[in-house]
């Protein structure tokens, strides 16, 4: 049955690729320049009368035949019970969190994207080393005179090789620039994120919440300057499924903010962009694959890719 012959009240409008459903906003523009809600006219431009065969989806960025957007309740239910139901649950969880933050039009079109079992993560030991380094750097931004003693500490604890070249530059620069200090001050967010991954912080604060967990973080870590051997050797991860979802959440938030630069639209969230970026970076580092047996050196931190 053709979509226009179906009873309107029985139809659900939904992208065939990512399952995004129209939100009542105007997302479409005709080649004549007219902007309108394409579903109010079944894909036909009210201005120039051009009939569009395909419709672009704001959720996944793909164009599919306009007629395929119209589905019955039964067809939607069949879609929702098809494929890997575990990954479907993850899709719903991630997209619900995005919507809750105000990122309403970003959807996952490939369920495989949500499968953390295909990822290879850093060891808990290396994650602990990176957490301590980030914590120390954030502290030293406000205590520059203590840098020489911290260099000695890093070497004594045998984690100096895990300090990145940019971090070493800061540690040995007599007069670091203000911009460098400002950038490095955000390292505390990466450290807290890794602490959450390592079960040293119970809950990560929301990206739009000014509350922090620094006190809990500090209580569950060794004092800066103390021995790290026992602490690092006993580090262990929380469920990788939780870690991976947090990574994807911040990856999609980065995509959202990047897209704002190009589409000129207003930010509809209250997300702290700097916090989200630091989480995105440190979690991307955590799930970066390195050859088995290879040493995780500091250079790898500076090379962390946050492109989307």
Where are these regions (language model features)?
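Short, intrinsically disordered terminal segments enriched in charged and Pro/Gly residues
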Residues: 1-17, 21, 61-82
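Residue-level marker of regulatory loop/turn positions in helix-turn-helix DNA-binding domains and
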Residues: 7, 22, 37, 49, ...
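Residues immediately within or flanking Cys/His clusters that coordinate Zn2+
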Residues: 10-12, 25-29, 35, 42, ...
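Extended, charge-rich alpha-helical interface modules
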Residues: 77-308
